[in-house]
Design a protein with these regions (language model features):
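Extracytoplasmic/periplasmic domains immediately adjacent to an N-terminal transmembrane anchor
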Residues: 528-709
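Conserved ABC ATPase "signature" region
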Residues: 103, 107, 114-132, 363, ...
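Helix-to-loop junction immediately C-terminal to a conserved catalytic motif
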Residues: 51, 315
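Catalytic Walker B motif of ABC-type/P-loop ATPase nucleotide-binding domains
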Residues: 161-164, 421-424
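Conserved ABC transporter NBD signature motif
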Residues: 59-70, 76-79, 323-333, 338-339
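Membrane-spanning alpha-helical segments of multipass transporters and channels
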Residues: 245, 569-571, 590, 611, ...
Length: 905
């Protein structure tokens, strides 16, 4: 095959922005092909289209001879393509070990146990990961994560390996080892094509064929030598800059003017044995350095080596665990606002306000830095002119190109004319022209205004522009000096070689070069049936989800303890029983008859007698404070009038009506007690009652009339509707947030396999929780039991299948865990509480309310739970409900499959 991939008139846009604009490209087979260019030019979008994880919008994409617009073709190609998405280890699972990660990927491709073990052994031996098979992926170094990601990609012998910026953020030594490993693997596995996106031009020098991209278009193709020759430049970086479209009069290149040293001047920044620990992790380990005023001081190191943490300590944003620092000879204290007036800080992420214009961002920061009002407008105009932002002063930041946003961020950082600028990787993802323009501005600030600049970077050519640099690794400064001094000190030809030499003395055996001698493509492969491959893929997600859940104490606690806590709090806290009513008496009669009346109230558990009151003013205060619910005043002469029998004696009773239901029930209790009191007196005196009819009330099913007996079965329904749905929706959305959803999109996994595989662990946990809740109902709340336990268990099984499926359906429309939890809780709780029979029977609801209730599974399970607990229902009584729960389970699964996207837009 001459071409591994072909793109014809391909365009791809995100809203109004073109990521790819009419791209036509033929990628040769059997070679290492590089896509070069800064962030945002369309490299990742192009690779996503080739890998099949993005949906083609316009044009044709053909990979390995198959049309990627055909879903069947994409599924078939899933076993021939390997895709490593952008972000170090982003497709790996941090809580799983090296072995478990690779076992998961092996299952995704339907490999049987013996084949998986053989391939894992072969790949880990070849990459040097064999000694670390049981180490969690989250605890691997950057270089080891690279190797593990590569092993995961190679476990099924792909014909096409797609790598999206695989070396971004790792140190130069790990970068070099990674590409040497790729070269050795390609020598063993002949015929494999590799397509790589990279922002490192020096890295691209080793590729066979390149496609240079800018602004969504391919601007040049050919070998590195061809591109350099055509541009008439010695390096790819310079050649790429030469190919970029330039505005008339635009300056190219950067010249570092010499700095005039000030003898005896107080250093701008001094760090003394700075240490920063986060729990047991040491991010910064005894870092010391001195930066004189006006110097450009560079921090060079990989992601996670402690650069950003050190910078935050020097701005006062983080308190050091040990050590201290000085700014211009003054001790820097945490929260020292005066010191911050001397600092301009530019973080890795743009800290601009998207809803404010360029001018408004500058005006806001001018106010935040307390620039006097009379000076503020003048200073904003000066900065707009200085950074060439006047023409776009009324534009919003999000609509600006990355290079201009970077310039605006620097303008914001310098609005208060600080003496120190701390810049944390400010040029990441910016094209070389904008990067050069940015550096010219930094050099001007340093040389013309004496501003001290402390900057971190990944780019070697940027580090060479610094007056001095420090090489940092694993929280420690390895060396400090000028670029030339460091190069000569290590006996190297370039600064990158000097950094690699410094790292080689520090790295452990885990980062040692790999040996691919045992690597072979001839692993015994047994062709598995289609059913076995499908089961293997489903079980891969079930096993992985179970392992991740068990190793996440927070999620595990929520899944197991959450239902118990909710049941106890709601079971004991939500009650419609009206008892322990406090009452007070003002007995002005003080006769046996009046005391007998008071005793009629105090002798039953529904009432608790408080201290007597003596006046209506005191009664008002008691009622206002809520100290009593009922008050009774017995007038003088009550007993005498009662014995005479000529007229009915009068008493006064006050009831707190602030809670109507409680007040009405109290009134009913009171009338009942007074009636009983009168009947007892009639029986004793021999006077017959005038009442001709006696009514006695009895309650079916809940004869004790305890609300807990009615509430607990309904609470089981509510809890099983809420917790399992939230757990299952988080499980899917976490894949989107962490980036591991790429494993689903770039492999042969079908949507139903993905969903059911992730759903199964939560079905098991939810069904286990059901039995725990039933136990609490029987033995803690002493709810009577009359029905069939197996029937209730069967209904509960279908119910939790439905509720976990409901959570997965919600996850298809959300992108973050916070939004998923919120949406699931709101959508589940409102109809469940109001329309599922929890408060009012579904049959008594208005037609629209009843329709809403019956549209959710809770309304079908609630009668089953209550009926089997209290009414003795059997299978014949609830068969329709169980059938409907099974239908809900199927409907939610089908809707989830339809809503889940196998490809990104």
């Amino acid at each position: 095959m001459e071409h591994v991939a072909r793109l014809n008139a391909v365009s791809h846009r995100y809203k109004a922005v073109f990521a790819l604009n009419d791209v036509t490209l033929d990628i040769p087979a059997g070679q290492v092909v590089g896509l070069i260019g800064p962030d945002g030019v369309g490299k990742s979008t192009l690779l996503g289209l080739i890998a099949g994880v993005r949906r083609a919008q316009e044009g044709e994409v053909t990979v390995l001879g198959q049309d990627m617009r055909d879903a069947r073709a994409r599924t078939a190609l899933g076993a021939k393509i390997a895709y490593m998405p952008q972000g170090l280890g982003r497709n790996l699972y941090p809580s799983l070990s090296v072995r478990e990660n690779l076992d998961f990927f092996g299952r995704l491709f339907g490999q049987k146990r013996e084949e998986r073990h053989a391939r894992i052994s072969m790949l880990t031996e070849a990459t040097g990961l064999a000694p670390f098979l049981d180490r969690p992926a989250g605890k691997l170094s950057g270089g080891m994560k690279q190797k593990l990601g590569l092993c995961a990609a190679l476990i099924h012998d792909p014909d096409l390996l797609i790598l999206d910026e695989p070396t971004t953020g790792v140190d130069p030594l790990s970068r070099r080892q990674f590409w040497e490993l790729i070269d050795r693997i390609r020598a063993k596995l002949t015929g494999m094509s590799v397509v790589v996106a990279t922002a490192y031009m020096e890295e691209a020098e080793r590729f066979d064929w390149l496609a240079a991209m800018n602004d969504g278009q391919v601007i040049a193709t050919g070998s590195p030598e061809d591109i350099r020759t055509n541009a008439g430049k010695a390096t790819l970086e310079d050649a790429f800059v030469e190919m970029l479209p330039k505005e008339e009069g635009e300056e190219v290149g950067v010249t570092l003017r010499p700095r005039v040293e000030q003898n005896g001047a107080v250093p701008a920044i001094e760090a003394f044995d700075l240490v920063k620990r986060f729990n047991n992790f040491t991010a910064v380990d005894h870092v010391s350095f001195t930066i004189p005023e006006g110097e450009i001081f560079g921090f060079l190191g990989s992601n996670g080596c402690g650069k950003s943490t050190t910078m935050k300590m020097l701005t006062g944003l983080l308190q050091p665990t040990e050590g201290h620092s000085k700014l211009f000879g003054e001790e820097l204290e945490n929260g020292d606002m005066a010191a911050r007036q001397n600092i301009g800080y530019m973080s890795q992420a743009f800290s601009l306000y998207a809803e404010l214009t360029v001018r408004q961002n500058l005006e806001l920061h001018a106010k935040l830095y307390h620039i006097p009002a009379q000076r503020r407008a003048v200073r904003v105009r000066e900065v707009l002119d200085e950074f060439e932002l006047t023409e776009i002063a009324e534009a919003l930041p999000d609509g600006l190109p990355l290079g201009i946003r970077q310039r605006l961020q620097l303008a914001v950082a310098t609005i208060h004319e600080p003496r120190i600028l701390i810049l944390d990787e400010p040029t990441s993802g910016v094209d070389p022209l904008a990067r050069d323009a940015f550096w010219r501005k930094l050099i001007s600030l340093s040389r013309d205004k004496g501003v001290t600049i402390f900057i971190s970077t990944h780019f070697m050519n940027e580090a060479e522009r610094c007056d001095r640099i420090s090489l940092m690794h694993a929280g420690r400064v390895l060396d400090v000096g000028t670029p030339q001094e460091l190069t000569e000190r290590r006996g190297a030809q370039t600064l990158e070689e000097a950094f690699i030499a410094a790292l080689e003395g520090e790295t452990q055996a885990e980062d040692a070069p790999s040996d691919t001698a045992g690597l072979t493509a001839d692993v015994a492969t047994k062709t598995a049936s289609a059913a076995h491959r499908a089961t293997s893929r489903l079980w891969a997600y079930t096993t992985r989800e179970t392992l991740e859940l068990v190793r996440d104490p927070i999620r595990m606690f929520f899944a197991l303890a959450g239902p118990i806590i909710l049941m106890l709090t709601m079971g004991f806290g939500i009650s419609f029983d009206v008892d322990k009513l406090s009452f007070a008496v003002n007995d002005m009669d003080r006769t046996p008859e009046s005391r007998r009346l008071v005793e009629a109230f105090s002798s039953i558990p529904q009432f608790e007698q408080q201290e007597d009151f003596s006046s209506l003013d005191e009664l008002d205060r008691l009622m206002e404070r809520g100290d009593v619910t009922l008050a009774m005043e017995i007038p003088d002469g009550f007993g005498k009038t009662l014995h005479q029998g000529l007229t009915a004696p009068e008493i006064s009773i006050w009831i707190d009506g602030s809670m109507p239901f409680r007040g009405e029930t109290t009134e009913g209790y009171t009338l009942g007690l007074l009636t009983q009191f009168a009947e007892d007196l009639e029986a004793e005196t021999g006077i017959e009652s005038s009442a001709s009819l006696s009514i006695s009330t009895r309650y079916l099913f809940n004869q004790a009339f305890k609300s807990a007996h009615a509430m607990v079965p309904s609470m089981i329904m509510l809890i099983l509707m809420l917790i399992p749905a939230i757990m299952s929706t988080i499980a899917v959305v976490r894949e989107k947030e962490t980036g591991t959803i790429a494993n689903f999109r770039a492999t042969p996994v079908r949507k139903v396999e993905f969903l059911v595989g992730k759903q199964l662990p939560y079905i098991v946990i939810a069904w286990f929780n059901f039995w725990v809740l039933v136990g609490l109902g029987l033995w803690v709340f002493e709810v009577p039991w009359y029905g069939s336990l197996p029937v209730l268990g069967l209904a509960a099984l279908f119910f939790v299948i439905a509720t976990t499926g409901f959570g997965q359906l919600v996850s298809a429309f959300t992108r973050t865990q916070v939004s998923a939890v919120f949406a699931t809780a709101v959508i589940a709780i409102i109809p469940t509480v109001n329309f599922s029979g929890l408060i009012t029977p579904v049959s008594t609801l208005a037609p629209i309310g009843r329709l809403i209730g019956l549209s959710f599974p809770g309304a079908w399970f609630q009668p089953v739970s209550v009926g089997i607990f209290l009414k003795g229902f059997g299978l014949s009584d609830v068969a329709l409900n169980i059938l409907m729960l099974a239908v809900f389970s199927l409907i939610y699964l089908v809707l989830s499959v339809l809503a889940l996207r196998k490809q990104e837009a």
